[in-house]
Amino acid sequence: MRCLPVFIILLLLASTAAVDVAGSKLKRRLERKPYQGSQAYVKKTAFGLRKCCKRHHGCHPCGRK
């Protein structure tokens, strides 16, 4: 019974590490993907949200100009 809390803590740590690895892989895959047309100025973040590139102005898809 004594080692049960330790086991739970280790399990939590392992699951958060797995989520971190999966998130970074997804992020890398989205960054590598080339965009065509008007989306060329838009960067995709890990959650699929659109974010303006700071280098480009007149970035319409995300609503800011």
Swiss-Prot record:
Upper taxonomic lineage: Eukaryota, Metazoa, Spiralia, Lophotrochozoa, Mollusca
Propeptide: 19-49
Job description of the protein: Probable neurotoxin with unknown target. Possibly targets ion channels.
Signal peptide: 1-18
Keyword terms of this UniProt record: Amidation, Disulfide bond, Hydroxylation, Ion channel impairing toxin, Neurotoxin, Secreted, Signal, Toxin
Organism per entry: Californiconus californicus
Main localization (coarse): secreted
Protein name in UniProt: Conotoxin Cal1.3
Coiled-coil segments: none
